[in-house]
UniProtKB/Swiss-Prot annotation:
Keywords: Cytoplasm, FAD, Flavoprotein, Monooxygenase, NADP, Nucleus, Oxidoreductase. It catalyses: L-ornithine + NADPH + O2 = N(5)-hydroxy-L-ornithine + NADP(+) + H2O; L-ornithine + NADH + O2 = N(5)-hydroxy-L-ornithine + NAD(+) + H2O. Its main location: cytoplasm. This is L-ornithine N(5)-monooxygenase. The keyword NADP applies.
Length: 431
């Protein structure tokens, strides 16, 4: 092994990218003066690329980018990204009078920012080993036969697609998680569909997939979005609710609440982000269903609440699913042939759990401080930090883009001390 790293960062998504930006902006220049390495399992930077559906927009303001909430004068703000591509690009965006850019453009912004830090990133490095070496008081990270020593660790592995056991038990390329929706394989299945398509889920991803399929398919090719809830639920994006759950300074309040009160409060706030759909999209979907009945006398493209998939059979070139009602037991099960089953069932933190189990082999859970530090990590000198996985402690916004910049600044301060003010100030001759 080579000389120990001062800091190893596991995972290269918005959380770690915003942290690198905070280090770039830090007055002590840790990127220049310290040995820092990022390890990413993918061959290149990417962020939810499989959901870059044409016409889909971000659900947060572009001002909540990788840098602006921490330092609006940073080079890496979204507005400067636009400006760096020319005045016409900046003017064009401003002329749209929108706070929510397209998902495609925001992904391009993230890739633009990431391209500046390529010398610090080890791609194709799926870190699946993390343990502590007491003899050297260092952490060891590794993938395959390659290992690195590090004094400090930041874990930003993000989330991984979750596929429920029923769907996972059926070995078929016709079952596609929403994270792969825009892949070539998925889009070929969509284009060639004859029997029909089924989307499982009741959140934003499921609704966006249904909408894209609706406009892509023949109007009479069967399409359904099914879920257990009675009806799709609109997301709560009112300003008071946004302030409570998504303003980063409220993490202090959430973290210091008694556990029972905090979990109850977070449960109430699930309608801001989990299994909900933007109201404008729900209105569009309802209108399209109405127009189908008007034109064809029935809905070929359906929204099916109170519906569960009881069984799935793999018939080679298609699937056969049995749909049942959860509440109306008098309703007979329905059998459908489908060409593709899109599973929009969310994500979990499996990669983080694997790393934590290797660091704490005796099933001892990680104790996370308000500053995102693992308090019971074994090193005497170094520290382990986590980001993007502590919503139960810090609040719902902790896993979202809107907190990334502020949290990154806090982590930079924790590891390398406070940064001297670098913001532009008015010239001395001004009053």
């Amino acid at each position: 092994m080579t000389e120990p790293l001062d800091l190893a960062i596991i995972g290269f998504g918005p959380a770690s990218l915003s942290f690198l930006i905070a280090l770039h902006d830090h007055s002590e220049e840790p990127l220049k003066n310290k040995k820092i390495r990022v390890f990413e399992k993918l061959p290149t930077f990417s962020w939810h690329e499989g959901m870059l559906i044409p016409g889909s927009n971000m659900q947060i303001s572009f001002v909540k980018d990788l840098a602006t909430p921490r330092d609006p004068t940073s080079y890496f703000t979204f507005l400067n990204y636009l400006h760096s591509h020319g005045q016409e690009r900046l003017s064009g965006f401003l002329n749209m009078s929108t706070l929510e850019p397209s998902r495609y453009e925001y992904h391009d912004y993230l890739c633009w920012a990431a391209s500046h830090f390529s010398k610090f990133v080890e791609y194709n490095a799926n870190i699946n080993k993390l343990h502590y070496d007491a003899a050297t008081d260092l952490y060891i990270v590794g993938h395959g036969d390659t290992q690195w020593q590090a004094k400090n660790i930041i874990i930003t592995t993000g989330c991984q697609p979750y596929i429920p056991p029923l769907y996972k038990s059926v070995d078929s390329p016709l079952i596609v998680h929403s994270s792969k929706f825009m892949s070539d394989h998925s889009q070929k299945l969509l284009r060639n569909s004859k029997h029909g398509i089924l989307v499982v889920g009741c959140g934003q991803s499921a609704a966006e997939i249904w909408k894209h399929c609706h406009y892509s398919l023949d109007p009479k090719t069967p399409l359904a979005m099914c879920f257990r809830n009675l009806a799709p639920v609109p997301s709560d994006s009112s300003p008071f609710v946004n302030s409570l759950y998504f303003d980063s300074h409220n993490s202090h309040w959430w973290y210091n609440l008694p556990t029972e009160a905090r979990l109850k409060g977070l449960s109430v706030g699930r309608t801001t982000n989990y299994s909900v759909v933007k109201e404008s999209l729900l209105e569009e979907m309802f209108k399209e269903c109405y127009l189908q009945k008007l034109r064809y006398g029935q809905e070929f493209h359906q929204i099916m609440g109170d519906t569960d998939i009881q069984s799935i059979k793999n018939e080679g070139d298609h699937l056969v699913v049995q749909l049942t009602s959860q509440m109306d037991k008098s309703k007979k099960p329905e059998t459908r042939k489908i060409d593709v089953l899109y599973v929009a069932t969310g994500y979990d933190h499996e990669s983080f759990d694997v790393l934590m189990s290797s660091l704490f082999p005796n099933s001892q859970g990680a104790q996370i401080s308000e500053e995102y530090c693992v308090l019971n990590a074994p090193s005497k000198q170094g520290k382990v930090y986590v980001a993007g996985i502590t919503s139960n402690q810090h609040g719902i916004g902790e896993t979202l883009l809107s907190w990334a910049a502020i949290r990154a600044g806090g982590l930079a301060k924790e590891l390398f001390g406070p940064s001297k003010p670098t913001a532009r100030v008015p010239a001395s001759y001004l009053n």
